[in-house]
Every structure is written in C-alpha cells, then in structure tokens.
Amino acid sequence: MWYSQLGFQSVIWTQLGTRVGLWLAYAVLIAAVGFISATLAIWARPDAADGSTIRVNGDTIEIGKSVSSKSARRIAVVISLIVGLVFGSQFNANWSEILLMFNSQSFGTKDPQFGIDNGFYVFVLPGLKLIMSAVSLLLLAGIIFSIVTHVLMGGIRITIPVNGHGLFHITKRARRQIGIWLMLNMFAWAANQVLGVFSHLTEEGSRITGATYTTVNATIPVTFIMAAITAILGVILGLWIMKSHTLEGSAPIAARASEALKAWKVPTVAIASAIVVSLVLTVAWPVLLQRFRVNPNAQEMESTYIQRNIDATRAAYGLDKVKAEQYKATTEGEEGALADSAESTAQIRLLDPQIISPTFKQLQQSKQYYTFADTVAVDKYDVDGVSQDTVIAARELDLDGLDNRNWVNDHTVYTHGYGVVAAYGNKVTADGQPKFFEAGIPTQGKLTDYEKYEPRIYFSPNATEYSIVGAPEGTKSWEFDYPTGSEGATNTFKGDGGPKIGNIFSRLLYAIRFGSDQILFSNRVNSNSQILYDRSPKERVAKVAPYLTLDGRVYPAVVDGRVKWIVDGYTTSDAYPYSQMTDLGEATKDSTTESSDTVSSLNSKNANYIRNSVKATVDAYDGSVDLYVWDQSDPVVKAWEKIFPGQYHQLSEISGDLMSHMRYPESLFKVQRELLAKYHVSSANQFFSGEDFWQTPVDPTESQQAQQRDILQPPYYLTLQTGGSSEPVFSLTSSYIPAGSSTREILTGFLSVDSDAGHEKGKIGSSYGTIRLQELPKDSNVPGPGQAQNNFNASADVSKELNLLESGSTNVQRGNLLTLPLGGGLVYVQPVYVKSSGSTSFPLLKKVLVAFGDQVGFADTLDEALDQVFGGDSGASAGDAENVGDTTDDKQDAKNDDSADGKTNTDGKQDTPSNTDGKTGGNNGDSSGTMSADLKKALADAAQAMKDSDAAMKKGDWSAYGDAQKQLQEALNKAIELEQ
C-alpha cells in the first residue's frame, strides 16, 4: 500500500519477485540435485543388501535395515526439500548482484592487466562468483547425499577395527557415482580459483589496492597453474575411485603399512604432490620473489602498478579532471589588496550553521512543539535580484515539546510543522541576531511571494510518529495549523500523502502494525482518512531506492512555491580494478557529524567507486518522492534504470527553480578530499616516496580532547572566486596541511568545487562539479587552520577583549574558521559569538576575527577586521558593513506585528506585549552600534586594572594586587551593565 501510493510498486515487486524467485529456484535446484543423487544411490543398491552394518568393537549398528527403495526415495525428497529451502534463503539475499549481472553496462574503459571492460568487474564478476558458490554448494550437496544414501542402502559397508581387523567395502556402482561427484566438485573448485584471479585487481595491499609486481608475476600465473592441478587431481582421484579394487573390501583396514601404502599409492602420491606443489608455488615462490627481488628494487618494480592505481583511483572517484594550479601565496597584507576580490569579499559567510541553530529556535520557534535542525543548511537564493548565501531551516514538528501527550494529540492534532526560516549568511542585526528575509508565522518574506505557497511540513527528519489526516467535506478541521489568537488556526490535509485507511481491513492492518487499537475505534479515523508514516525524507528515499547510498545531510529548499527536501544519492562499487579502497564512513566523519544529530557520515562500508548519480526530492507537504538521474554517464545508475524502468525522471524534467538549489554534496566532496590528499600526486615514483602527501586538518575550533582524536574540519559552502574561475561561484571548500605528526602546521593546498548547478531547466551549469586545487609552494609559510587559530589565541589584544566578553554570566563561542584565497594569499575568517548563561539565551554575533599571514584583525565587523590586516583599507567592502547601522527599520517592523498572536517579523525578533519596539538585547544607548564614551572608559579602566594586577603580582605586593583585582571587577561589571 505504501509503495503503491507513492507510485513505486515496481520496486517492491521486482525486489520481492527476484528474492523469492532466487530462493525457490535455488531450493528446487538443491532439492533436485539431492533427490537425483539419492535416487541414483538407491538404484545402485546391492541386490542382496538390506541396509548397512557398522560394527564397532563388537557392537553391531544396523543402518537402513528393512528400508525399501520406495521409502528411501520419500525420505530423500523430504530431506532434500528441507536442505533446499534452508540454503535457498541464504542465496536470495544477493538479489542485487544477480540483477546487475543480467543488466550490466559497459564502462568504456578496460583494466590494464587483462584488457577487460571494467563493467565485467563491477557487474558480471560478483554475479559469477555468486553463481559458482551456488554451484559448488549444489555439487557438495550431491556428493553428501550420495555417500549417505549408499551407506544407508548398503553400497558402502564399514566395519570399525576389532582386535586389529576391520573392513571397508564400496560396491562398483557406488564407486562410479562417488567418483563422478568428486570430479565435479574438484572442477567447481578449479573454476572458483580461476574466478579468484580477477579479484586480485581489487585486493588491498600494504600500499595500494590492486595487483602489484609479485601478484602479477607470481600469484596470478600460479593460480591458473593450481586451477589446472586441481582439475587434474579431480580426474585422477575420480578415476582411481571408480577403477580401484582396493575399496572392494578384499583386504582388512588394519593391514600392514606397506600393503596399505601400495594399495593407496595413487591417491596418496597425487594428493601429496599437489600439496607440495601448492606450498612451493603459492607460498614459497611469491615470498622469495617479494623478499629478494622486489623489496630491494621496490620503487622501480612497483612503479607500473602504482601508476595503474593512481590512474584508476582518479577515474573511479571523479578526480581525473581536477584543475590544479600553483598558488604563490603571500603573507604580507597590503593596502587595497582585496580590490580585485570585491565580489567574493562581499559574500563571506559569517553565520555558523551549527552555532546559530539555538538562535533560530529562540527567535523563530514560536512554540515549544516546533523545532529546527541542530545544524541549519547553507544554500543560495536570489534576493532582490542578487544571489545571497543563505542559512535556512524548516520549522519542524517536535512532539516532545507538547505538554499534553496523548494518542489524539500525537497522531491527529499535531501533525505538521510550518514554514521555513532563512537569513542572510553575511548579515546580522545591530545586536548580533541573524537578519532574516523569510520568517514568522504565518510565513512572510522574500521566498514565499507565490500565490499558492504551501508552508505546511508534514514530512521532515523530525517527524518520527505516524499521523492520521483527512476528513469528510464540511467537517470542522481538527489539525492544529499554527498559533494565532487563543486557540490557534486549524487545517485539514488535502493532499495524497499516505495509504487510505477508510475501510475496516486497512484500519485493522495498521492497528496491528503500529500496535494501537485507537486506529480501530477513534472517530478521527473516517472514510477520507490517510495514514502518514515513514515520514523522514531520507527513510522514504531509502525505501524506494534501497540500492543507493544516501548522503548524511538532508536540506530543505523552497521550490516553485513548495518546500522540498533534497537528498543526494550515490551509486558505489567495491569492484573497480586498481582503484583505492576507502571506508566511506571514516572518510566522511568530521566535527559536524560527530556533534550533530541531523548530519551524519555515510554508513561504514568499503568502496572504490562512487558517483553522485541521483538527486532525490521529497515534498514536505505530501511526501511524494521524485528521483532524478543526475550523472547520466554513470554505468551503475544506467543498470538500475534498466532494472526499474519508469522509476527515474530525466535531467530535462528538473525545473529551473529546483536546479538552482542542487548543490555539490558534502559526503562526496569529503571522500574526494580524502583521496586527493594522496592522489594529487600523479607520478608513481613521487607517490612511492610519500614525501608530498597531505591531510585534512583537524577542526581547531573543537576542544583539545576532540583534536587529539583527530576530528577533522568540515568543508564549508562559500561564494568565492578561485582556481581559474572567472567570477565568484558558490563552492564547497576545504584545505590541506602536510601529512604526518609534525607540529609545524602550514597550508599546502586549498581545495574547492563549483557547487552552483545554475538555474536553467534541465541543464546543469557548465562549471558545476569542477574541482579546483590550488597548491602552495613547498617553501610556503602560510599558516594552516590550526596555526591561524593559535595566532588568534596568542594575540594579546584579542585575549584581552575575549576575557572581557567572557566575564560575568556570558561565554564566548568561536564559529567556523573559514579559509579563503583572497588578496594574493589566504585569509582566515572566524565569527565570534557571545552567549549568556541563561537557559533561554542564544548566541549573538559580536565580533569577527581575521588573519592574513601572521597578522590578526579583531573588530565588530568583518569589514573593519579586514581593514586592520590590510593596511587600514582592504580595498573591498564586506557584506556586513551595515551590520552596526541604524535599526529603525527593525523597530518599525516589530511595531507592525501582532504580538498577541505570537507572530515574528522577518528580522527575527519575536514580539511580546512588553517589548513593542522590537529590541531583544544589545546596547540600549547608542543605536548606531558604536562604542559609547562610558563603555570605552569602563574598558580602559579594566585594562589598567589588569596591568596594575600584573605589576603588583611581580612585586609580590599582594595588598596592591587585591585592590587592583577589586577595581578590575568593578570595571567589568560597569562594562557589562553598559553593554546590556
């Protein structure tokens, strides 16, 4: 019902049909093999035999006595069916490998060892291995059924030695059957060995993934030889069993050793020879070759195979078209240095998406039953004709915030969130709050000027409970819509968002599924009711496309008047020849995924091929899922399109508005930066030495404990001009420092990828996905992020002001440390937030730190801080130049809102009857945002008191030290009073 309502019923039927089909097919095959094997053994039953007798130390055990051939066949049928069903259930779990094998695609590139298209390894080889494993199990079942049945039917008679005498007898018919089964099993073993040869091309070694010199020149040839030996050994043993009279029981088991050796000479010599040859060829020869030939000349002998690994890795991870350039960065800030980077400077994002989430909640949550993601999203929107970096979040439903929890409220009244909230990425109000351009309840602002805008959020990451919606025409609405007046507005869901449960059968079904009898008896469930469940966007996409690996971040976008959740889907493989294997979970961990509940790393699994082949959207109102083929050149998604025809929309169907919000996904970028830290090196010899390997820096804004655990700095979305781009581009960025444990952290590279897909219907922007790498010279002394953070911390002026900000009941939070290639060098920008210790407090942007080389700027605005490090005039105006400007408009907006209705204005201030001028804090005196004379004096007094304290402590004058400390406390209290 759920899949049918979404229009993805083919997914469940194809998957279910394939799994059941494989299970039944394999169950029938293994049952048939077992039955045929047993039937042949029954047919070969000796005429005079009545079962088999086993004597153990004088005790007689009779097996199969008085069992007729007809009864034996019946027993064989039952046992073979049971075995078939058990093993068939294990085989059906690999349904995807079978489907991909029969729908394989060509990659158009060949592996460098065998010259076979890479599609064979990705699609066909896994299926062949599965089939050969199944065949091996079938043949093993055949020989087991044969031996057991022959024992039961008297074809094999065993007498355990008594006083040194025993007997082992196998009839001629039994020997023929067992010999044939043995040969077939050995042939299957040989075939598996041959298939295993191809797996060497994805074998993980100590340095690279793929076949190295020893593998190519020893292991692979030896494997073919051993496969031939295995097949020959099977023929020898099979023929010996069929023709030898030794097994007819003419001699006792405990005969003299010489006689036994003579009788069993052929199998003994054959097996012993095979073991010796195997040890020499598969163990000794590769070890000796590696030890005495390869290791002393490793760089020369491995270079060919390292180059194969480099080329394959860059191709498999989409790194073969990286635009790299040398960037001779300066560390001397000159006046006017940013004049040529004015557009990039104006777009520098100051709002940290993780730190400001509490601010969003405090200013825009409105009621306790709403919430926002703990890490808001970064996107871009055209506001008044200008592209703006934006922080955006959906106002989701949070049932945990309800005071009165019961079934009616949880499942029929509080059913949805309401609207999105968006703020400029580089602007704040005079008191440090985000400057919203979309906010409030009902929603108002720049994004919702559509005639039919739909703000209701029925489907979201936080919607974990099911909801029952819908009512007959004319019925009074009971769904709570949004707070207004004394009771709030109500609404009735009008979409097609879930299975209908109007009939008693559906109600009973879902009552059982959710363990709730209320679904059966509640009057809220009616003929028009729908049940909404599995409401997380990521969960919905995962169910309709279970073969995709989904990005750890889901973000909202306002598209054509509706709120859409955008989910990035990846096609992956672990079978691309010579490409380096990567743990996707480890590669995508960073400080954000470690601390956030709404952003996660990819699931831990090994892969050596990845593409962002699919973009999925989930409508926040009706939950409809749309899958779009994003990378049309990817053979893997082509295979899935063939398996599930009609499931995907083509690129041409993406609207211009939706296209403008498609961005380069973070998880893919993190995997690529992990690989590029080594694979920016294109020379095999240089790669072997490892002297130019890099690493992603740890996040210097995290605690010391987190840094010791190597929690990496996340990538950041920024609009900037870099690496040969002709104009500023919305990009995803990161940086590199030298690999290893050196304490000298300098910047070695700056990585960015163009993330703007454009805004043309059905056409991806020409530069989208272009990866740009700016490599710094080896003698560069540009500080890395960690060193830049240390420079901030070591600055006496910065420390002094931060100490003042942290006094009393406030604390300082450092925002994301951004790295930007500006002014001929690298500029570091870090917003500084101040938060009081109250339970309802929230961070406010108060200061901005800037570093260029070893120079540090610290001011109320980015504009001022940039001027400090660039000779008093940076030559460009940052986007926050007006952040300390007049707040008259803010106050007027606040006055115009209806405080009794709990509305919020687009500048972010929640109205209350006692605060009609819209202020929520900040300096109540000077509205221009400049420091008042009294505040300057208080700060100067505090600074002087600190100097007096230091001087007194050095002299050991503790009385004077106590007086200075008292004066310091008084000055700080005065400063705090003036600042509030």
Question: Which residue stretches match the model-derived regions?
Answer:
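Soluble extracytoplasmic regions of secretory-pathway and membrane proteins
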Residues: M1-Q5, Q9-K955, S959-A964, L968-E979
